[in-house]
Swiss-Prot record:
Monoubiquitinated by RNF181. Residues 8-22 have a biased composition (Basic and acidic residues). SMART domains: AAA. Component of the 26S proteasome, a multiprotein complex involved in the ATP-dependent degradation of ubiquitinated proteins. This complex plays a key role in the maintenance of protein homeostasis by removing misfolded or damaged proteins, which could impair cellular functions, and by removing proteins whose functions are no longer required. Therefore, the proteasome participates in numerous cellular processes, including cell cycle progression, apoptosis, or DNA damage repair. Component of the 19S proteasome regulatory particle complex. The 26S proteasome consists of a 20S core particle (CP) and two 19S regulatory subunits (RP). The regulatory particle is made of a lid composed of 9 subunits, a base containing 6 ATPases including PSMC2 and few additional components. Interacts with NDC80 and SQSTM1. Interacts with PAAF1. Interacts with TRIM5. One of its GO terms (biological process) is proteasome-mediated ubiquitin-dependent protein catabolic process. This is 26S proteasome regulatory subunit 7. It comes from Rattus norvegicus. Belongs to the AAA ATPase family. GO terms for cellular component: P-body; proteasome accessory complex; proteasome complex; proteasome regulatory particle, base subcomplex.
Length: 433
């Protein structure tokens, strides 16, 4: 029979004699092996996880969720008397509107409420509501039996308008904006100084400017500056795109603008940023077809909210556009937009600063001549310089390197600035600004 294993793979009796006996691991060796690969806090973390599992098990046992098919607590835990008392004390209310207050200064005032599509009633207040909480025109909650006023309700605002409010501040700061030093100073005078030092304006007897128009070619940092302002102030920030206010049905856009400012007045201080305002703020004209009538109604409502019969309050308004020549003169007048800030192309110092800002978060070699790169990018916007830095990183990735070199930046300048010049609309937009 042929030996398929071979002599080198087959054990002999002499080899078996030389083999050492296999010793079983004791408990100490097993405990030592278990500690391999564990961090300093592994034991504490495991202990906390076990405690959490025990608490969850105890909670489920008390509520009886696992034992019940319906997910209800077991009947032994029911409190029917307390549930009935809760139902009697907390009954569903009907929404109405208080249209007038009769004998408001007396001890027993009466309130005229209007229940929509039903009737009008003269009612009293319940014991839980103070007379100072109710005002004329306010939405209130009334019971279905005596129609007494139980709670005051906040104003009705469209959920689409409420969702425009930004809860988290943008992560852009003034140090992330390059080539706009003068523009940032003008913005801070209008937005930050009235909020932080209002006594300066009171002593002089003037009202601070409340509206700013940011205009300039695309990519010069208008929206970036607005995000930096929102990061610096503690005011509520509401960004609005102009095209969001262009609605299909008549009156919808004007209603959204009205509710937007109504929500802003409820805040202590508010900053509203209208981006691409030329979508609704164009000059009025009659084309004969009436296609732009709804857009013009939206703009008229915006004009009224900016400087109309009702005071604007502590609301700052920023607007950004690439085409200031198309805006309506009524929107541009002082009192509505007090300050116009032009964002022009950055100079040599600004372009160098923009290169350093974008290279700050990149892995680049030392001693890159950013001023030389800035000289090779004349008449370039901040967005184009950012594209140069991104392309330099792509060249480094293509060459399988971990850092970007100056040669990568030079090749990126040739690709973005020189090759893409035919796609640039900056010269055409410079004639509009």
């Amino acid at each position: 029979m042929p030996d398929y294993l071979g002599a080198d793979q087959r054990k002999t009796k002499e080899d078996e004699k030389d083999d050492k006996p296999i010793r079983a691991l004791d408990e100490g060796d097993i405990a030592l092996l278990k500690t391999y690969g564990q961090s300093t806090y592994s034991r504490q973390i495991k202990q906390v996880e076990d405690d959490i599992q025990q608490l969850l098990k105890k909670i489920n046992e008390l509520t009886g969720i696992k034992e019940s098919d319906t997910g209800l607590a077991p009947p032994a835990l029911w409190d029917l008397a307390a549930d009935k008392q809760t139902l009697q004390s907390e009954q569903p209310l009907q929404v109405a509107r208080c249209t007038k207050i009769i004998n408001a200064d007396s001890e027993d005032p009466k309130y005229i409420i209007n229940v929509k599509q039903f009737a009008k009633f003269v009612v009293d207040l319940s014991d839980q509501v103070a007379p100072t909480d109710i005002e004329e025109g306010m939405r209130v909650g009334v019971d279905r039996n005596k129609y007494q006023i139980h709670i005051p309700l906040p104003p009705k605002i469209d959920p689409t308008v409420t969702m425009m409010q930004v809860e988290e501040k943008p992560d852009v700061t003034y140090s992330d904006v390059g080539g706009c030093k003068e523009q940032i100073e003008k913005l801070r005078e209008v937005v930050e100084t009235p909020l932080l030092h209002p006594e300066r304006f009171v002593n002089l007897g003037i009202e601070p400017p409340k509206g700013v128009l940011l205009f300039g070619p695309p990519g010069t940092g208008k929206t970036l500056c607005a995000r930096a302002v929102a990061n610096r102030t503690d005011a509520c920030f509401i960004p609005v795109i102009g095209s969001e206010l262009v609605q299909k049905y008549v009156g919808e856009g004007a209603r959204m603008v009205r509710e937007l400012f109504e929500m802003a007045r409820t805040k202590k201080a508010c900053l509203i940023f209208f981006d691409e305002i030329d979508a609704i703020g164009g000059a009025r004209f009659d084309d004969g077809a009436g296609g732009d009538n709804e857009v013009q109604r939206t703009m008229l409502e915006l004009i009224n909210q900016l400087d109309g019969f009702d005071p604007r309050g502590n609301i700052k308004v920023l607007m950004a556009t690439n085409r200031p020549d198309t805006l309506d003169p009524a929107l541009m007048r002082p009192g509505r937009l007090d300050r116009k800030i032009e964002f022009s192309l950055p100079d040599l110092e600004g372009r160098t600063h923009i290169f350093k800002i974008h290279a700050r978060s990149m892995s680049v070699e030392r001693d890159i001549r950013f001023e030389l790169l800035a000289r090779l990018c004349p008449n370039s916007t901040g967005a184009e310089i950012r594209s140069v830095c991104t392309e330099a990183g792509m060249f480094a990735i293509r060459a399988r390197r971990k850092i970007a070199t100056e040669k990568d930046f030079l090749e990126a300048v040739n690709k973005v600035i020189k090759s893409y010049a035919k796609f640039s609309a900056t010269p055409r937009y410079m004639t509009y600004n």
